[in-house]
């Protein structure tokens, strides 16, 4: 079972449907309706932290969940969830170079992590006005994808722990290879830690 932390975003259930379509059971909990003990009691095989409005500081249980469970369970952060992963390890979240609400960008990547087998220079939907401050990217994390048009970080992963973040929206119908990226995360959750 995969636990989806809902950050009060309209895209959350698009993610739920995309994951469920791959045969996975998904349990959804709002970021203010579950605590760390509740997460542990559910014993999920993986956690996905959804997009949402605001900043990681306003994302309920998300920062504490990452701080306490990183390395013990695979975690994928999407948009706000991506930012939460960076901030939980000491990264700074800053205003993005450009506000990108419902805009398409070409995404270039290095073929690592979630992008193994994904063609380079694909199109993805972005909905964000905040981004990870690259000089503050925490130790142990690597950038795996960027937006071609503005160079903004579009994906990170941890070199040792199963932690992945994507700033763009893989669940959007307008994102090329979004389903394959989500499938890649699911396949990584099936490996023993």
Indicate where each model-derived feature is located:
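Short amphipathic alpha-helix with an adjacent loop that forms part of the alpha/beta core around
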Residues: 35-43, 136
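Extreme N-terminal starter segment of soluble prokaryotic enzymes
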Residues: 1-3
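Phosphate-binding/catalytic loops
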Residues: 5, 121, 165-176
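Catalytic beta-strand/loop cores that center a nucleophilic Ser/Cys/Thr
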Residues: 113-161
């Amino acid at each position: 079972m995969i636990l989806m932390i809902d950050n009060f975003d309209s895209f959350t259930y698009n993610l739920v449907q995309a994951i469920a379509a791959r045969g996975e059971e998904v349990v959804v909990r709002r970021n203010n309706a579950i605590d760390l003990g509740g997460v542990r009691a559910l014993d999920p095989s993986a956690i996905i932290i959804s997009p949402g409005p605001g900043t990681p500081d306003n994302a309920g249980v998300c920062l504490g969940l990452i701080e306490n469970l990183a390395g013990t369970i695979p975690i994928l952060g999407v948009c706000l969830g991506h930012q939460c992963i960076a901030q939980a390890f000491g990264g700074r979240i800053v205003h993005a170079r450009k506000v990108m609400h419902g805009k398409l960008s070409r995404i270039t990547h290095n073929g690592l992590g979630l992008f193994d087998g994904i063609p380079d220079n694909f199109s993805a939907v972005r909905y964000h006005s905040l981004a990870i401050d690259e000089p503050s990217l925490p130790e142990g994390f690597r950038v795996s994808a960027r937006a071609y048009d503005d160079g903004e970080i579009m994906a990170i992963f941890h070199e040792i722990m199963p932690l992945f973040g994507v700033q763009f929206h893989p669940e959007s119908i307008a994102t090329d290879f979004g389903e394959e990226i989500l499938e890649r995360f699911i396949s990584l959750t099936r490996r023993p830690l």
